[in-house]
């Protein structure tokens, strides 16, 4: 049986900065959520192929061409332990065609605890002309013995050229839903769901049919 996931995402735009926030309930312990996030951080720093295979399921090219107006293809990742940052390399696709190749992004991860809540902040320090400023925080919070919440707050300000191209509408159609789906992937993995591209194809079809 297919259950369509219905979510509510809040996105604002102020002075060129997009801010997306989202929270979802997770039917498992905070220990399981933390293990999933630990695995995600490890893959982010050391294994981009596994990161894509496990956590980016359903985030790539879509049948709905509007969702392909702008998206990124992750190519490689290197972690520099002495500097405590990751160096990522990706391609930018516009309307499903290569637009920028081998864009270098340097980012760092800061993992802290605030009481029982875990906050994982990712800061982008360098992204060439693609991004002027970007940072985001994932929050993992226990709400019961086998109940948790996963939340995100993401801020993105693109470089001047992309600010012309990426309107609020384009951002909504190409980026918003991918951020939400990434959090949903973290949730489903924590709950023990075996994620596949077919899983999200069925979910998308169910939402369209509603």
Write out the residue ranges for each language-model feature:
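Terminal "cap-and-tail" regions of soluble proteins that handle hydrophobic small molecules
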Residues: 2, 10-33, 39, 137-210
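Hydrophobic ligand-binding cavity/cleft-lining segments
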Residues: 2-87
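Mobile, glycine-rich extracellular loop/lid and propeptide segments
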Residues: 134
